[in-house]
């Protein structure tokens, strides 16, 4: 009985926080009317080492004693498993957590003292917290996980034994990625040989020889195994893909140069397909949990493939755009997830393979327009199907750069189905998507002759550019070259069939050639048009003079 009276006496003589902890009649829940965080710049995207400023707003209906406010900045990594209603938390990790007291003390020196108190009304507490520079990644949220950062504040008792109320505010963090420091990529080459020739070539070797030794012997001197080298190199297709840079900024145009060395003349209206791909990999947490991989095709470019009958070579320039809504390359180690970008180039080396889009629309079919190919007396003029201009998309008033034509972001070619077909080969090159490019660093690297830009190995692309034969920079340049460069005007997309095959290229200042009908093409008038023309010639009403 005495113990109970003593406890009630201590409770009455203590602070309101003690009454709440031990079940007093005053409640902190009813005392707090509003509790939130106001950021100095609510729409700012923060970077490492930036200082987040703002105010904590606390509105009380009644005074409180013995309380403190603790500010925190925390980053969390969450990985989900499953999809939809079956989604559940698979893994969670705290990237960093830092806190500081903005009102009150950590631990009071005397447990009997009442500590800090707050009166009734509005209270504003300014704060400043610096974003760390280590173990931090760009904010992201998707179906399989998220990386989030939040500024929070906790109203607690003076000893920190109980959290009375809390509030938080999400912030967006962007980790800058400078692509000017990345080295230049070397061209990637793919060699395609006939399976029958490989089987016949392997029969001439001992059983212990492998495919790698076969490749080495085919590139050896002509004195050893000359017969096998001749057979394997006679029907070999070499595809070389070259990228000018290994890193690109959001909004950049990726210029791809493709060089093909064929063993015969070949043409295909949808022979080359370049795709900007984003691969997401969700790492496993154990042996029983496999790694998940997801693919997203961002944009695509389709170009015609025409192998010259004399040289059996083809050089094509293709363009891809990094969209403005893309996010930088993200790699989170230690059971996290990664987002990496790749340039995938496919070569369709069979005219029998039909290229379909996601909506089952055929590209390069019989409904395409034809453009003439350069010919000679020995090689007659042939035709190749040209992709329709509607694939280029509607051009705006300021979109006068035709280098971005034939780049589409919707209704793309189903690359997975196309790769399963025969005589379809290709390669993929990883690129880094960054946030900015330091132009001064890039210019210094280009001006320095000893900088390792392209390595010591010279490629077919560099040899051709050094010899003076500049490669085309866009798909439309290929069309102009195939049509004997009828006009170099950017806006002249209509081909004029009446020009002679040996006419030279025209400059921008030259007058446009006049149209002359070509006798090689049979032109027949439509029957309906003839009837409409006859009806127009007939007089619908008698003239006034005849009536008089």
Curated annotation (Swiss-Prot):
Species of origin reads: Eremothecium gossypii (strain ATCC 10895 / CBS 109.51 / FGSC 9923 / NRRL Y-1056) (Yeast)
Could you cite one Gene Ontology molecular function of this protein?
protein-macromolecule adaptor activity
Functional summary from the UniProt entry: Required for the proteolytic cleavage of the transcription factor RIM101 in response to alkaline ambient pH.
Top-level taxonomic group: Eukaryota
Gene that encodes the chain: RIM8
Similarity-based family: Belongs to the arrestin family. PalF/RIM8 subfamily.
Q: Where is the composition biased (Polar residues)?
A: 439-449, 456-470
Q: What protein does this entry describe?
A: pH-response regulator protein palF/RIM8
What cellular component GO annotations does this protein have? Answer: cytoplasm; cytoplasmic side of plasma membrane; cytosol; plasma membrane
* Region span, Disordered: 439-470, 497-516
Q: Which GO terms describe its biological process?
A: cellular response to amino acid stimulus; ubiquitin-dependent endocytosis
């Amino acid at each position: 009985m005495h113990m109970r009276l003593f406890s009630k006496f201590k409770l009455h003589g203590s602070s309101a926080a003690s009454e709440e902890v031990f079940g007093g009649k005053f409640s902190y829940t009813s005392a707090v009317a509003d509790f939130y965080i106001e950021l100095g710049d609510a729409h700012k995207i923060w970077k490492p080492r930036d200082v987040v400023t703002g105010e904590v707003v606390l509105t009380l209906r009644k005074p409180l004693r013995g309380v403190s406010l603790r500010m925190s900045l925390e980053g969390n990594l969450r990985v989900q498993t499953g999809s939809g209603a079956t989604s559940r938390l698979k893994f969670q990790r705290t990237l960093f957590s830092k806190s500081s007291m903005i009102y009150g003390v950590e631990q009071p020196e005397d447990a009997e003292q009442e500590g800090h108190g707050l009166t009734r009304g509005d209270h504003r507490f300014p704060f400043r917290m610096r974003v760390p520079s280590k173990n931090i990644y760009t904010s992201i949220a998707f179906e399989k996980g998220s990386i989030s950062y939040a500024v929070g504040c906790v109203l607690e008792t003076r000893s920190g034994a109980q959290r009375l109320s809390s509030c938080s505010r999400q912030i967006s963090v962007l980790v800058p990625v400078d692509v000017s420091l990345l080295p230049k990529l070397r061209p990637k080459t793919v060699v395609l040989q006939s399976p029958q020739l490989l089987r016949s070539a392997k029969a001439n070797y001992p059983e212990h020889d492998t495919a790698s030794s076969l490749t080495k012997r085919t590139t050896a001197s002509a004195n050893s195994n000359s017969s096998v080298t001749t057979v394997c190199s006679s029907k070999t297709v070499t595809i070389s893909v070259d990228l000018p840079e290994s890193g690109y900024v959001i909004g950049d145009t990726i210029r791809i140069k493709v060089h093909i060395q064929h063993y015969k003349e070949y043409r295909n209206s949808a022979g080359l397909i370049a795709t900007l791909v984003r691969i997401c990999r969700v790492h496993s947490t154990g042996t029983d949990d496999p790694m998940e991989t997801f693919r997203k095709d961002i944009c695509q470019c389709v170009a015609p493939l025409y192998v010259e009958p004399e040289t059996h070579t083809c050089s094509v320039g293709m363009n891809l755009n990094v969209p403005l809504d893309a996010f930088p390359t993200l790699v989170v180690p230690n059971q996290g997830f990664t987002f990496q970008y790749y340039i995938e180039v496919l070569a369709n080396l069979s005219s029998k393979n039909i290229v379909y889009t996601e909506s089952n629309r055929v590209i390069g079919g019989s409904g395409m327009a034809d453009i003439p190919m350069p010919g000679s007396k020995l090689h007659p003029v042939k035709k190749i199907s040209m992709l329709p201009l509607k694939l280029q998309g509607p051009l705006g008033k300021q979109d006068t750069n035709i280098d971005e034509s034939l780049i589409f972001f919707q209704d793309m070619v189903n690359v997975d189905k196309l790769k399963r077909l025969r005589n379809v080969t290709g390669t993929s090159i990883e690129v880094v998507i960054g946030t900015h490019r330091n132009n001064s660093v890039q210019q210094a690297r280009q001006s320095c002759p000893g900088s390792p830009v392209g390595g010591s190995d010279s490629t077919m692309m560099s040899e051709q550019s050094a010899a003076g034969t500049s490669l085309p920079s866009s798909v439309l340049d290929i069309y102009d070259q195939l049509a004997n460069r009828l006009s170099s005007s950017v806006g002249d997309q209509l081909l004029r069939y009446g020009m002679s095959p040996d006419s030279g290229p025209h400059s921008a200042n030259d007058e446009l050639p006049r149209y002359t009908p070509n006798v090689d093409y049979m032109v027949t008038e439509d029957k309906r048009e003839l009837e409409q023309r006859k009806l127009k010639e007939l007089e619908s009403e008698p003239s006034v003079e005849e009536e008089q």
